[in-house]
Amino acid sequence: MSDAANDTKVRFDPERLTFNEAGLVPAIAQDAETSEVLMLAWMNAESIARTLRTGRVTYWSRSRQAFWVKGETSGHVQELVDLRIDCDRDCLLVLLRQTGPACHTGRRSCFYTGVRDGHEQELMTPQD
């Protein structure tokens, strides 16, 4: 029996993704080695193309309305390992190698607050 995943190769076209009304798609950043979810950001067709072209993960900043090359100013670079598309083509999983903390608060992950027994609990502190 053949492996269907290896039988067909379709050229990736970012325009075939399902973008929201602002032309954006959510992108989940995940450490390729540990599988830890690091952050959620937004990408448009051009930021996806730039990411694939350069290997440096590039998002679209909704607040600044500009491209955001992760680590360009902080040095906390995200290097692309793999890009995956979900089944509905409306969300991306960006597998990457993270240098330093991913969160602007200095924490490894933006998901540093847990909810325990109805209360918020800080699960990690900023890295030095």
UniProtKB/Swiss-Prot annotation:
Enzyme nomenclature, EC number: 3.5.4.19
Gene Ontology annotations of biological process type: L-histidine biosynthetic process
Catalytic activity: 1-(5-phospho-beta-D-ribosyl)-5'-AMP + H2O = 1-(5-phospho-beta-D-ribosyl)-5-[(5-phospho-beta-D-ribosylamino)methylideneamino]imidazole-4-carboxamide
Binding site for Mg(2+): D86, D88, D90
Keywords, ordered alphabetically: Amino-acid biosynthesis, Cytoplasm, Histidine biosynthesis, Hydrolase, Magnesium, Metal-binding, Zinc
Cofactors required: Mg(2+); Zn(2+)
Domain of life: Bacteria
GO cellular component term, pick one: cytoplasm
Family affiliation: Belongs to the PRA-CH family.
Oligomer and partners: Homodimer.
Function, in words: Catalyzes the hydrolysis of the adenine ring of phosphoribosyl-AMP.
Record-given protein name: Phosphoribosyl-AMP cyclohydrolase
Organism of this sequence: Roseobacter denitrificans (strain ATCC 33942 / OCh 114) (Erythrobacter sp. (strain OCh 114))
Lineage: Bacteria, Pseudomonadati, Pseudomonadota, Alphaproteobacteria, Rhodobacterales
Name of the encoding gene: hisI
